[in-house]
């Protein structure tokens, strides 16, 4: 079976991971600091913190935004009256993070051409209570961030504030917009959260990281990821940091450990080659599948350089299930990857019409595109897309 996903693990990790395991320092320590420094260099952003999952980062992001902060002109967030706009087509982690903060949800419909959020629908749902917008870069293909910034300005003129953007970048490690990395300059002013789970481009076994737009949120997030305690030993002059803290604001146990960080540190140097291979495969599929009857390819904005964690197609004319079954018979794994979140019982109070998603879920299929595909695999995928 040609897999839809595959774990990338560098052979370079074996010796350093063993050294960490035998060092006596396996929780958050020097390897976490080294990994964060490497990520800051790769992303071009000095405000990066590693975490034990992207779910933790998405939860922290909204928690950080509840407090008013005049230092970056943020009005704060009232969980009794304010709402979060969030996509329904995503991993449930996105939705779980909003629910964990006890905040009301309004679902955003999808753009049929990208599977990203529909900016027209978003504009129609902006209100005086829309303080935060979550988005997902579906498959690694960035959302139209310029269009999104125009809507932030629209909100400023109409309601007196710019909604804060939280980018769920679980699919989008290495993606670029206007020549800059998502999570770096391309995402200026936004909070971004990345997944380092097993099957992502960059993996730490499990984990994630968050990028912050300013020093104020960075410093506060650094506290909240470990109970609200300052772990910087330089501030304690030899005293026990566990005993010398007055916790001003409670936090969580969301930090990364040195074992996971070491995996990330030694996998990171391979990412540019991995991304290049995924993009080459995707470009070849674009050319070979563009005229296949019954299949519609997704659009990529010319400003975007997708990470291609997924290669998504639309199978038309009610043939989705038949197509997926025949691909399976031919030894090719396909999937929708994520189910729509709005149908779950725990969010039944927030349901509303999403006509584009109703259509797209009947057509959306992801086919293998990754760095692991051989030339024979690629030929088989293309051949079977034509046949099926």
Model-identified regions with their sequence ranges:
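Short, conserved catalytic or interaction motifs in soluble domains
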Residues: 110, 198, 369
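Phosphate-binding glycine-rich loop
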Residues: 25, 29-83, 97-101, 107
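Conserved active-site segment immediately N-terminal to the catalytic lysine
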Residues: 160-204, 219, 243-248, 296
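PLP-dependent aminotransferase-like
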Residues: 67-172, 176
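Short beta-strand-to-turn element immediately C-terminal to the catalytic PLP-Schiff-base lysine
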Residues: 194-195, 208-213, 265
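PLP-dependent aminotransferase class I/II
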Residues: 32-38, 42-49, 55, 120, ...
């Amino acid at each position: 079976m040609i897999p839809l996903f595959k774990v990338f693990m560098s052979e370079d990790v074996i010796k350093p991971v063993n050294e960490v395991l035998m060092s006596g320092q396996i929780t958050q320590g020097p390897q976490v600091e080294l990994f964060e420094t490497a990520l800051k260099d790769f992303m071009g952003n000095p405000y990066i913190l590693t975490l034990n999952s992207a779910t933790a980062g998405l939860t922290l992001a909204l928690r950080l935004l509840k407090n008013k902060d005049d230092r970056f002109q943020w009005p704060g967030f009232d969980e009794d009256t304010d709402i979060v706009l969030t996509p329904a087509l995503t991993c449930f982690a996105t939705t779980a993070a909003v629910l964990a903060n006890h905040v009301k949800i309004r679902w955003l419909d999808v753009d049929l051409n990208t599977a990203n959020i529909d900016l027209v629908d978003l504009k129609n749902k902006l209100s005086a209570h829309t303080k935060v917008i979550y988005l997902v870069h579906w498959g690694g293909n960035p959302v139209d961030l310029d269009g999104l910034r125009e809507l932030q300005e629209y909100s400023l003129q109409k309601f007196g504030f710019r909604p804060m953007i939280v980018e769920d970048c679980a699919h989008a490690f290495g993606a670029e917009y206007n020549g800059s990395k998502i999570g770096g300059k391309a995402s200026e002013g936004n909070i971004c959260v990345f997944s380092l789970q097993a099957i992502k481009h960059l993996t730490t076994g499990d984990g994630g990281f968050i990028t912050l737009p300013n020093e104020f949120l960075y410093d506060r997030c650094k506290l909240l990821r470990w109970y609200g305690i300052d772990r910087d030993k330089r501030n304690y002059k030899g005293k026990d940091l566990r005993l010398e803290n007055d916790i001003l604001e409670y936090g969580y146990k969301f930090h990364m450990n040195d074992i996971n960080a070491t995996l990330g540190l030694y996998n990171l140097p391979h990412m540019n080659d991995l991304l290049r291979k995924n993009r080459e495969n995707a470009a070849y599929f674009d050319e070979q599948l563009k005229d296949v009857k019954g299949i519609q390819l997704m659009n990529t904005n010319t400003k975007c350089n997708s990470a291609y964690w997924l290669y998504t197609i639309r199978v038309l004319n009610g043939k989705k299930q038949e197509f997926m079954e025949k691909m399976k018979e031919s030894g090719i794994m396909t999937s929708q990857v994520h189910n729509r979140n709005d149908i779950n019982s725990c969010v039944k109070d927030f349901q509303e019409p999403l006509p584009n998603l109703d259509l797209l879920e009947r057509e959306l299929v992801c086919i293998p595109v990754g760095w692991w595909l051989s030339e024979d695999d690629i030929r088989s995928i293309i051949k079977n897309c034509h046949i099926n």
